[in-house]
Amino acid sequence: MKKELEELNGFKDLRIVDNFYQTSSFFPMPTTEIGTLSESGLTNLGSYSLCFPYYIAGKDYYAMILCCRNSSNTAKNILRTGKCTINFITDKRKYFKEAVRLGYPGETTEEKMKDCIFNLVDGKRARENPNEQYPKIIQEAFQVFECTWVRELDGAENDKVQDEYLPPYHQFNGITSQFGAHFLSLIHIS
């Protein structure tokens, strides 16, 4: 009876799989590529939908919050450098296919970025500060935020890359659980 109702109403039963929010879910979420710097200085791209406005008014700055696994390349690179870019990509099929590929965990930056289809270029911060290193931005993106992690909030300034994270955890910034991290990042707008 349930199957008949689903077919009658036009719905289909989908199997939930890893990265369900990118592969099986259809609520409107942006697809972003978070650019960070690997230990070797290469730009690493990781696919994320869990990136939201945080400070939008009433402050001297604006900020986004990124939710991710604390074992991801993205989290480790932000913990080390405090820098990231949020690259909003368009809905072209080839870009979504690349986002799925780049979102798969477990590869080194060198392995993952070897066949990347996006053109990476220097952003405004790199051009304005040539003596400092920043993650490159995606030329094909329709919008890019260049960000700096606000380490000082919630006492996260002492968070470092580790193999395992034990309590206590922070409430909203830095390492927030055994497997999770949230990064409150200042958007550089000029």
Residue ranges and their predicted role:
Residues 1-47, 52-190:
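Active-site-proximal mixed secondary-structure blocks
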